[in-house]
């Protein structure tokens, strides 16, 4: 029998949208009105190489016995009983509600693996709502956007520890460093059309596996190939070139670009191929911005380097240009390559391995605390309306990419410039080049906020 997962949560958190995305077709009716799904639907879901049965349920909601709402809840309880694991979905934009808290207890009592999915996490408000969901005690929230397909890579990583392989026994242990090293690194190679992506992979494979041509747009689909380098496995996605939206005219090409975006979301490391003779165009910057938003490690591969005239200081100039145009991922590794000639391949593969290690990094608590005290001492937060902002403490909530929550007195008053200072200082201190660093602000609860003043 197929491994079965039930999607549960209160009404209108995006359960049916997630169901449709995993099943790959619009089987469930989706609307903004709560309670659209009135019975449970089952479908065969696929997430990368994982196959399982998914059950979409009506929103968990309490109602009078015998009412439609009560029958919807009965269907949900039946789905939970049938399931091997649960997706507990919340709306990150709304944040936690009393219903979420009540039904989190309901999910815990099921005594089954639960993945907490903070849906609609795109944007600043979604990030805050996701951090708030730690209070449910269901583990680390996985930030996703079912509508836009964001966070599917993180969902895959968590799900692969729960969904058993076809023939092997289930292994629910947390992935160790040794296990991570034995698993192929997922790499997406992206860039403008005709940047040389397929030529590079063909040289890695030693065969004409991927069609190459001087004509831009030869690759229509996202194609995965297995590569081994120095005993380490890689699953590399060659993608259709990402063009400017105004130039995407054919329906087939629109689908190809969507496929490339999916490859970025499933990847752990993204290699952005730049043309040595025509680098850092607007579309390159847009692609890099997408990689940062998706929280992926970035490596810059400057292709066709063999066509450049040898001049001293070229790489240093390239480093300055990259940090100028890509301040959101300062220090991204730069590798000069020639896909056609096979030059720089070893340097590129080593850069991918190192970027992957940085992306997975967890900072020791003692070192994080020492850095935090020093960063504030060197550059205290600014005063607002004559009052100094208080930064209480910082903690790392996850890796992949390194993400932190900073507890402070007034989250809305801390300027973005100061937040950038903290990110850059952390990146430099802990050597986190080329990977997004997330710092989410959260106000520390004031225990006296709700107490009345004593009458004089």
UniProtKB/Swiss-Prot annotation:
Positions of the EngA-type G domain: 3-167, 185-360
Pfam families (UniProt xref): KH_dom-like, MMR_HSR1
Any Gene Ontology biological process: ribosome biogenesis
Gene3D superfamilies reported for this sequence: 3.30.300.20, P-loop containing nucleotide triphosphate hydrolases (3.40.50.300)
This protein's record includes keyword Nucleotide-binding: yes
Biased composition (Acidic residues): 166-178
Residues that hold GTP 2 according to the record: 191-198, 238-242, 303-306
InterPro entries linked to this entry: G_ENGA, GTP-bd, GTPase_Der, KH_dom-like, KH_dom-like_a/b, P-loop_NTPase, Small_GTP-bd
Region (Disordered): 162-181
Family to which the UniProt record says this protein belongs: Belongs to the TRAFAC class TrmE-Era-EngA-EngB-Septin-like GTPase superfamily. EngA (Der) GTPase family.
NCBIfam families: GTPase_EngA, small_GTP
Function as written in the Swiss-Prot or TrEMBL entry: GTPase that plays an essential role in the late steps of ribosome biogenesis.
Quaternary structure and partners: Associates with the 50S ribosomal subunit.
Protein name: GTPase Der
The organism of origin for this protein: Bradyrhizobium sp. (strain ORS 278)
